[in-house]
Curated annotation (Swiss-Prot):
The lineage of its organism: Viruses, Varidnaviria, Bamfordvirae, Nucleocytoviricota, Pokkesviricetes. Together with the penton and the other minor capsid proteins (M1249L, p49), forms a complicated network immediately below the outer capsid shell, stabilizing the whole capsid. Three copies of p17 encircle each p72 capsomer in the inner capsid shell, anchoring p72 capsomers on the inner membrane. Required for the assembly of the capsid and icosahedral morphogenesis. Additionally, inhibits the host cGAS-STING pathway through its interaction with STING1 and subsequent interference of the recruitment of downstream components TBK1 and IKBKE. This is Minor capsid protein p17. It is a single-pass membrane protein. Induction: Expressed in the late phase of the viral replicative cycle. GO terms for cellular component: host cell endoplasmic reticulum membrane; membrane; virion membrane. It comes from African swine fever virus (isolate Warthog/Namibia/Wart80/1980) (ASFV). Residues 96-117 are annotated as: Disordered. The keyword Transmembrane helix applies. GO terms for biological process: symbiont-mediated suppression of host innate immune response. The chain crosses the membrane at residues 39-59. Belongs to the asfivirus minor capsid protein p17 family. Interacts with the minor capsid protein M1249L and with the hexon capsid protein p72 capsomers; these interactions form a rigid zipper structure that stabilizes the capsomers. Interacts with host STING1. Glycans are attached at N12, N97.
Length: 117
């Protein structure tokens, strides 16, 4: 890239490189001058990240527990109907059972008794 054609771009690039080098130099100088302090600060930073991850995991588990303690749908939703050749997903089976096999579906009272026993 020619500096005569785009002096602004080359100036911007050189300024950016200078800032980058001075920042790296300052960081290296600080680490060399205060190795103990730098190690302590890095250790604290790593511990904070670990604590943050643990808090996030605990919070996520509590959120999952709250979802599991929410009111559940009636037990008839989970009961498996006895079918000899069952190869369909639940929604197909529900539709078929609602018309042809009403006698096999227990009432809510019977299901509540089964759940409590």
């Amino acid at each position: 890239m020619d500096t005569e054609t785009s002096p602004l771009l080359s100036h911007n690039l050189s300024t950016r490189e200078g800032i980058k080098q001075s920042t790296q130099g300052l960081l290296a100088h600080t680490i060399a001058k205060y190795p103990g302090t730098t190690a302590i600060l890095l250790g604290i930073l790593i511990l904070l990240v670990i604590i943050l991850i643990i808090v996030a995991i605990v919070y996520y588990n509590r959120a999952v527990d709250c979802k599991s303690s929410m009111p559940k749908p009636p037990p008839s939703y989970y009961v498996q109907q006895p079918e000899p050749h069952h190869h369909f997903p639940v929604f197909f089976r529900k539709r078929k059972n609602s018309t042809s096999q009403q006698s096999h579906i227990p009432s809510d009272e019977q299901l509540a008794e089964l759940a409590h026993s």
